């Protein structure tokens, strides 16, 4: 997996090929062009959260898997939502921020975004970007599927374990 793509692009292509879909079939199902699917897989265009959720539903995998938050999908307790509710997503983001006792400014700094974006996310005025969602999950050890409503309860992850696994994988690749 050594190229310019990130884990998101690698996984959306891997799952598509594994279940036997062509880029054209995915494009038709999602109502988009085949070239957009290709551009996602090549890492030329960032996939929006709305489209990522549609892909997760189509592929029947958790968003956490596509984002690289988890590596195993067996027995993962997610359910798919049919309609994204920006206010509910915002409330979950606010909950994560409050649990960590952070102001919107500090929260924004930790995930490398603007405070105004956090404010808009929390009040349901703006859909969270896929990059910000992934950063929240990695920084605070929370589930993307929980944030978007696919899980009723958050599955808290130990960030240190994730880092150790990453270190082990790198050592294996380098040896």
Regions found by a protein language model. Name each.
Residues 1-18, 75-99:
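A short, Lys/Arg-rich alpha-helix, primarily the initiator
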Residues 17, 28, 57, 98, ...:
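Alpha-helical residues within the helix-turn-helix
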Residues 20-39, 101-119:
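Short alpha-helical DNA-recognition segment
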Residues 25, 36, 46, 62-65, ...:
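Residues in the helix-turn-helix
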Residues 50-65, 131-146:
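DNA major-groove recognition helix of helix-turn-helix/homeodomain DNA-binding modules
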Residues 68-88, 92, 148-175:
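Short, charged recognition helix plus adjacent turn
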């Amino acid at each position: 997996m050594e190229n310019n793509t990130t884990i998101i692009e690698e996984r959306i292509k891997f799952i598509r090929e594994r279940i036997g879909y062509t880029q054209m079939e995915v494009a038709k199902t999602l109502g988009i062009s085949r070239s957009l699917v290709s551009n996602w897989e090549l890492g030329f265009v960032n996939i929006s959260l709305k489209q990522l959720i549609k892909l997760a539903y189509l592929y029947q995998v958790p968003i956490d898997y596509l984002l690289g938050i988890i590596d195993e999908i067996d027995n993962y307790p997610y359910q798919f939502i049919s309609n994204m509710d920006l206010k509910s997503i915002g409330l979950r983001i606010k909950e994560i921020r409050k649990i960590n006792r952070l102001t919107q400014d500090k929260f924004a700094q930790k995930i490398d975004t603007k405070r105004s974006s956090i404010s808009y996310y929390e009040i349901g005025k703006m859909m969270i970007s896929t990059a910000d969602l992934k950063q929240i999950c990695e920084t605070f050890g929370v589930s993307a599927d929980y944030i978007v409503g696919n899980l009723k309860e958050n599955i808290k992850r130990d960030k240190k374990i994730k880092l150790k696994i990453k270190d082990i994988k790198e050592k294996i690749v380098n040896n």
